């Protein structure tokens, strides 16, 4: 009750900044894609982004990260990503493109603004950020997942006295030189970080299942085909037994191919426990470890929506075609499936 009183008192003192048709929360690629179509339809909107500049999650990605598809398949609506130096665009090239895209269309963007909660007010949604708020007929949440890294908590990792970090906080391989490192996770981030760290450290790759590699001549374009086929099937009310593009998840970009030539793209089953300076495998054997890099994915960043009663116990929001099923003027984009 005390916390509720304080919240209401703060809100009563908050200053209305603007009334618009739509508030977009987040400033990454999903937010920009949404903004493009709102502007085309002449819908009034504002983007509230908690970053200091354009680029979204890419601002925090590790230095060597690359897109998994060529620039021609990685563009937003209206303006193609310029030709890049390499087949797969680099982190900096993506940031430059997103920044230029935002400037090109002159989207009304305010940053840094951290939205802490939203309240319903009659038919409107009031979007609060500290002592400021924006009133909207609808809200598009595009906060993504990068700020909510997922790390398994059921194996006693608090016992481990070595280095632990998530891929969200990984920058480059330098801190791991000459160390014994375990990379956990069988997706693209795990493969890319393993490829880089294995050049300077003794590495072990841990995955729950055998890594699934795409063929060398197949890239991230296959994911677009899969997503399109899945969406079409959903709209037509049918199920898919085999998705387009064949098997595999890990894109064989140059750094991963190079790691293959060094024989490091082999993994083993997950360890079952931590000790202070080692991990314990299922057979009871131990392995000395200096650092663990968790490439274990992310959860949706939904804290700002909790006061609306739309976040389910499994920490998701039930949607149909991107629209909240509990609140019809709330939309979510860019969170994956």
Predicted features by range, described:
Residues 53, 62-65:
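Aromatic-lined carbohydrate-binding/catalytic grooves of carbohydrate-active enzymes
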Residues 63, 72, 123:
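Residues that flank catalytic or metal-binding motifs in active/ligand-binding sites
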Residues 58-62, 69, 217:
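Short, flexible helix/strand-to-coil boundary loops that buttress conserved ligand/catalytic motifs
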Residues 67-86, 234-236:
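Glycine-rich flavin
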Residues 1-27, 33-51, 55-57, 86-337:
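Flavin (primarily FAD) cofactor-binding/catalytic cores of flavoenzymes
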